[in-house]
Amino acid sequence: MKSFKNFYIRNNNLVQLQNTSFESPLITTNSYVYYGDLSLAQKQNFKWIAGGNSLLPQGPILINDTTVWGFTVPFPSGNQCLALQSTSFIEQSMYMTTGLHTISFYYHTRTGDSGNPINIVIDNSIIGTTSSVAVNSWTFFSQTFTTLISGNVIVKLEGTLSTTTGIDNIIVV
C-alpha cells in the first residue's frame, strides 16, 4: 500500500472516471483504430487523454470484437477494449477523497508478445505495475493505495516496453 502527500485540490467538483470500458466512440465491429487516427469528435467522446508510442499513428489502439490483436473475445466488459502498445498511455482526472482506494482492471498480453507491464500512476507516482509475464487470457489486476488529501488527481495507465497489452473495465473505488 502506498501513501501520497502531494495530492492537491484542482477544484471542488466530484469527478469520476468516464468510458472505463472504452465503448465510446463506437467503432465498426471486427475492427481497430489508433487513437491518432480518431477524429476530434471521436477523441472528445473517448474521454481519456492519450498518447505515447513512437510508432505512427501515435497512441493506444481502440479495438472492437476482433482477434487480430490476439486478445480473447469476448472482452471483459462490452464489445471494445484498448491496447497499450509500446509506451502509449491513457490518463484522466478524477476526484478522490482522503483514505483507502483500489484501482482494478483486466489486462491481456497480445498473443506472441512477451508481457508489456502496465504502470498504474496516480499524480505522477507509480502505485503498481502489472506482471511482466505474458498472459494469454484476460487477467484481473487490483492495487490498493491511500490518499492523504481529498481532491482531483490524474489517473494514468502507461505501457513500458515495445510489446502490446490490452486493458478493459477500469474501476476506482
Give the location of each predicted region.
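Σ70-family region 2.3-2.4 aromatic/basic alpha-helix that recognizes the −10 promoter
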Residues: 154
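Aromatic (Trp/Tyr/Phe) and Gly/Pro-enriched flexible surface segments
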Residues: 2-100, 104, 111-121, 138-148, ...
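Surface-exposed loop/edge segments in extracytoplasmic proteins
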Residues: 124-130
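A short, sequence-level motif marking secondary-structure junctions
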Residues: 131-136
